[in-house]
Amino acid sequence: MTPPGRLYLLRVCSTPPLLLLGLLLALPLEAQGLRGIGLTPSAAQPAHQQLPTPFTRGTLKPAAHLVGDPSTQDSLRWRANTDRAFLRHGFSLSNNSLLVPTSGLYFVYSQVVFSGRGCFPRATPTPLYLAHEVQLFSPQYPFHVPLLSAQKSVCPGPQGPWVRSVYQGAVFLLTRGDQLSTHTDGISHLLLSPSSVFFGAFAL
């Protein structure tokens, strides 16, 4: 009679290798002597869940809303301390430009409204061109880059009082330290009121 120990060895040796491999894979890692090699819960998460995001749920996101200064003369000036205008969570206003506090996606918007009493001279009116542009100045560029731009024209032709509005808005990937500013043609025709002329941005 074969001793039990020898019989056990014979049975193992006669087992097909593929069956042994399947049994081994079915065992828990601890039973295989591989304690500590298993994936941690964080490592087992999908890769897209581990990407860093600049803003997490509950984080107060940067936002700014500016309105046109009624004392504007040669160029459109912005202010943030009145008429529901504000600077929040990192945004600041310097040299009439918004300073981006954190890198990320931002919705940038602006509106202006132009108005006039009519076309001059009335006999042979000349075209009047109106334009408004939001510009980006960044350490990556040596000059102002247009982000949003729109143009309108009024006249020629006999007409009475007129009003033209321009609204623009889009999403941009901005970098901390970027500066957002505006350029406007037709300053003398701006209808300066908080609900008509404004400029802002907020993080997404």
UniProtKB/Swiss-Prot annotation:
Which first-to-last residue range defines the signal peptide? 1-33
Family annotation (InterPro entries)? TNF (IPR006053), TNF_beta (IPR002960), TNF_CS (IPR021184), TNF_dom (IPR006052), Tumour_necrosis_fac-like_dom (IPR008983)
Q: Is the keyword ATP-binding in the record?
A: no
Q: Which GO terms describe its cellular component?
A: extracellular space; membrane
GO terms assigned for molecular function: cytokine activity; tumor necrosis factor receptor binding
Glycosylation positions?
N95
Q: Which Pfam families match?
A: TNF
List GO BP terms, alphabetically: cell surface receptor signaling pathway; defense response to Gram-positive bacterium; humoral immune response; immune response; lymph node development; positive regulation of canonical NF-kappaB signal transduction; positive regulation of chronic inflammatory response to antigenic stimulus; positive regulation of extrinsic apoptotic signaling pathway
Kindly list the cysteine pairs connected by disulfide bridges: C119-C155
SUPFAM superfamilies found in the cross-reference section: TNF-like
Task: Tell me which UniProt keywords the record has, alphabetically.
Answer: Cytokine, Disulfide bond, Glycoprotein, Membrane, Secreted, Signal
Localization in the cell: Secreted; Membrane
Predominant location: secreted
Report domain THD positions: 62-204
Q: Does the keyword Membrane apply?
A: yes
The record's function comment reads: Cytokine that in its homotrimeric form binds to TNFRSF1A/TNFR1, TNFRSF1B/TNFBR and TNFRSF14/HVEM. In its heterotrimeric form with LTB binds to TNFRSF3/LTBR. Lymphotoxin is produced by lymphocytes and is cytotoxic for a wide range of tumor cells in vitro and in vivo.
Q: Of which family is this protein a member? A: Belongs to the tumor necrosis factor family.
Query: What quaternary arrangement does the UniProt entry report?
Result: Homotrimer, and heterotrimer of either two LTB and one LTA subunits or (less prevalent) two LTA and one LTB subunits. Interacts with TNFRSF14.
- Output this protein's name: Lymphotoxin-alpha
> What species does this protein belong to?
Bos taurus (Bovine)
